[in-house]
Amino acid sequence: MIYTCTMNTAVDLFVETDELLPDVVNRTKDEDYQPNGKGVNISFMLKRLGLDNTALGFTGGFTGRFIENELLNEKIVTDFVEVEGISRINIFINSTREFKIVNKGPLISEARKQELINKIRQIPPGRFLFISGSLPRGVPDDMYLSLSEIAAENKLKLILDISSPVLLDCLSYHPYLIKPNEQELAAFFSRKKALSEEEIIHCGKELLDRGAERVLISRGKDGALYLDRQRTLKATAAKGKVVNTACAGDAMLAVFVGKQELGCSVPEALRHASAAGSLTAFSKGLGDVSKLDQTASQIQITHL
């Protein structure tokens, strides 16, 4: 069984309009509501690959019920901690440019935080645990450290996709895999300019030296890089019209891990992972897994 943990679940509202103007009523051409949060996205993608998983985290209010119902509709097991308030609503506007409006999330009490910690302590050894995304109000960054320590103690395969600089401290617990994007990677190492490919690889190797077992770096239109202690691989991206980049990294991560669980080699899993990221970028929500093989045929893998 695979477990995902999303501490700041969300409902994402995707809207499309010809243009977005100030001080007037902007009418949309299309709208779509999607259950979201990085771990939630990963749960959907894993299930669509045929992999059972359990979704953990915090949910609240009518939005929380929507998120949980959508997961249950796809036969995904849920074990959320219900909190006061409502799970946040984020807005993504596709106009002449892409706009992203992301809210903070509900305030989490100490009791509810401890309840989630206790659920994670009960995960059997050897299982995958994805900890992904931001933290809601009331949950300090050291929560990532606490959960990383529990994962190490319980011999879980910990996968981290977080933008907090605390990630660097979590590396001492030797996570199975981490997935920064280029911007996060630059921020972790206090680089103010965009990184060259050579610099990205250097930073990725530094993360390995600090304790990560594997590093997957999502690069948008430039595909992805994968590093472990034996190899460095580069994947291109597929070509298409970008609609929404919000969930592409989540799809990439889920498919990279999921395909290996289904027996694929690392290079083949990376090929499909890059395809999943591209398909999602070309969609309003998560990419269609039925198109994975066809899209993966466009992806080139290079050993660096």
Curated annotation (Swiss-Prot):
Pathway: Carbohydrate degradation
Family matches, as InterPro entries: 1-PFruKinase (IPR022463), PfkB_dom (IPR011611), Ribokinase-like (IPR029056), Tagatose/fructose_Pkinase (IPR017583)
Keyword Iron-sulfur among record annotations: no
Role according to the record: Kinase involved in a D-tagatose catabolic pathway. Catalyzes the phosphorylation of D-tagatose-1-phosphate (Tag-1P) to D-tagatose-1,6-bisphosphate. Can also use D-fructose-1-phosphate, with 40-fold lower catalytic efficiency, but not tagatose-6-phosphate or fructose-6-phosphate.
Organism (species): Bacillus licheniformis (strain ATCC 14580 / DSM 13 / JCM 2505 / CCUG 7422 / NBRC 12200 / NCIMB 9375 / NCTC 10341 / NRRL NRS-1264 / Gibson 46)
Catalytic activity: alpha-D-tagatopyranose 1-phosphate + ATP = D-tagatofuranose 1,6-bisphosphate + ADP + H(+)
Enzyme Commission numbers on file: 2.7.1.234
Gene3D superfamilies per UniProt: 3.40.1190.20
Pfam families: PfkB
Keywords for this protein: ATP-binding, Carbohydrate metabolism, Kinase, Magnesium, Nucleotide-binding, Transferase
NCBIfam families, per the entry: 1-PFK, pfkB
Cofactor: Mg(2+)
Annotated protein name in UniProt: D-tagatose-1-phosphate kinase
Any GO molecular function: 1-phosphofructokinase activity
